UniProtKB/Swiss-Prot annotation:
It is an enzyme of class 3 (hydrolase). The gene is mch. Keywords: Cytoplasm, Hydrolase, One-carbon metabolism. It comes from Archaeoglobus fulgidus (strain ATCC 49558 / DSM 4304 / JCM 9628 / NBRC 100126 / VC-16). This is Methenyltetrahydromethanopterin cyclohydrolase. Pfam families: MCH. SUPFAM superfamilies: Methenyltetrahydromethanopterin cyclohydrolase (SSF56199). It comes from the Archaea.
Length: 316
């Protein structure tokens, strides 16, 4: 069986060979665990963002960055595809593990989840778990973890601390922006699973999503990076069997659709649980049904809200 941790660990080792070029910095802690700073105290880079995203997806995706325009304004876009969508997206990339140790907090994603089974029901659903002796986790945080945090992760994954790698990037960073846009296929797979579609029926997924400009703080950046997916992210999916429920996947089916996410979050008194979960989805999907040969298109792109979120200033 494929080991997302073993494949991802090879990518991390490649990153460590090119720290200066990638503008990242690694540190071996006293317990042997390796922390890779991808944007906390270093600038990071687009290439680091690509590799970070590949690590998050357990090495089971191809990720690149291209430049395209939205209403004649140039933007960088993440493009990606995976032929193992359930494992790469739900079994690895999904930010399904909240890391809380003393005062340290981070959203954990990546292959280590498949060892710790966070959350267990996800792995029962996709019928997958990893049994590697190395664990690779990606932490969305503005602080680097210490030995105690890495010890906790190692224990949950049932591996030795010296066999744990943690990639760390804040939301408001180059790598942060890239890796969140790199979740565009995952948001589609996640939503499909949430509304009752069997993720094991998804054969492949390919997506494209603009990379948010880096905003002034993590809170604003959280808004703009989510808006990248919700208002301009598009996904092409190949499935064994189409289902009418898939028309409910795009973000425009949400009652909260139509405003920048930061405004929605602020109106909800910064309480995620007050926001309609249907909002967290791609703007548009196209679904190719292998049973009939038809391709069904749902959703729409919305440059107007995206430009508000990105704080775009156009010449008069």
């Amino acid at each position: 069986m494929l080991s997302v941790n073993e494949i991802a660990a090879e990518i991390v080792e490649d990153m460590l060979d090119y720290e200066e070029e990638l503008r990242i910095e690694s540190k071996k802690l006293e317990n042997g665990a390796i922390v890779v700073d991808c944007g906390v105290n270093v600038p990071g880079s687009y290439d680091a963002g690509i590799m970070y995203t590949q690590v998050c997806m357990g090495g089971l995706a191809d990720v690149d960055i291209v430049v395209d325009t939205i209403n004649d304004v140039p933007f960088a876009f993440v493009t990606e595809y995976t032929d193992h969508p359930a494992i790469a997206c739900l079994g690895s990339q999904k930010a399904g593990w909240q890391i809380k140790v003393d005062k340290y907090f981070a959203m954990g994603s990546g292959p280590a989840r498949a060892l710790a089974l966070k959350p267990k029901k996800t792995y029962e659903r996709i019928e997958y778990e990893d049994d590697a002796d190395v664990a690779v986790i990606a932490l969305e945080a503005n602080q680097l973890p210490d030995e105690k945090v890495m010890e906790f992760i190692a224990k949950e994954c049932d591996v030795d601390p010296e066999n744990v790698y943690a990639l760390v990037a804040p939301t408001a960073s180059i790598v942060g922006s890239v890796q969140i846009s790199g979740r565009i296929v995952e948001t589609a797979i996640f939503k499909m699973n949430e509304i009752g579609y069997d993720p094991k029926l998804i054969v492949s997924g390919a997506g494209r999503c603009p990379i948010s400009p880096i905003l002034e703080n993590d809170l604003k950046a959280m808004g703009s990076t989510n808006d990248s997916m919700m208002y301009y992210g598009s996904v092409f999916l190949t499935v064994k069997k189409y289902d009418e429920i898939l028309k409910n996947v795009p973000s425009c089916t949400s009652r909260d659709y139509g405003k920048p996410f930061y405004e929605i979050f602020k109106a909800a008194n910064y309480d995620f649980y007050k926001i309609d979960p249907n909002l967290f989805a791609p703007a548009q999907i196209a679904v190719n049904d292998l049973e009939t040969g038809k391709t069904y298109v749902h959703g729409k792109l919305n440059a107007e809200v995206l430009f508000q979120s990105y704080q775009i200033v156009l010449e008069e």
